Regions:
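N-terminal helicase ATP-binding lobe
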Residues: 1-122
């Protein structure tokens, strides 16, 4: 099994409201769209969302929902890479939203600054 498969039963889908933390409707829609895509297809999917809409939370949530064995995230810059690595290694946004319990252990995260050129390196 994988971290995301093992942790999936603890994943929740709270909807944000005025008085309660949760995932925003656009985030829930994107998570469900990603899951629906992979029910019938095995080719890559693309999630497009505006800046500030919570793409990183969707990215991490999708790994849980899809029970991913391994996740490769390619970032366009060092700053974005560092932000995403921090978010994945703490699961802070999903915990704040109530999608995961505060005591949920985080996955192992490895960042690389160079190209991975062999299966062994992967």
């Amino acid at each position: 099994m994988s971290y995301f498969s093992d942790a999936y039963p603890a994943f929740r889908y709270p909807l944000k409201s005025d008085d309660q933390a949760g995932l925003r409707p656009a985030q829930l829609g994107a998570i469900h769209a990603a899951a629906a895509h992979f029910v019938t297809r095995n080719d890559p999917g693309v999630i497009t969302m505006p800046t500030g809409s919570g793409k990183t939370a969707v990215l991490i949530a999708a790994a849980f929902v899809l029970r991913a064995r391994r996740v490769l995230i390619i970032a366009p810059s060092r700053l974005v890479r560092e932000q995403i690595a921090e978010e994945v290694s703490t699961l802070a946004t999903l915990k704040r939203a109530g999608a995961l319990a505060e005591d949920t252990p985080a996955p192992r995260v490895h960042t690389t600054k160079t190209r991975i050129t062999s299966a062994e390196a992967w």
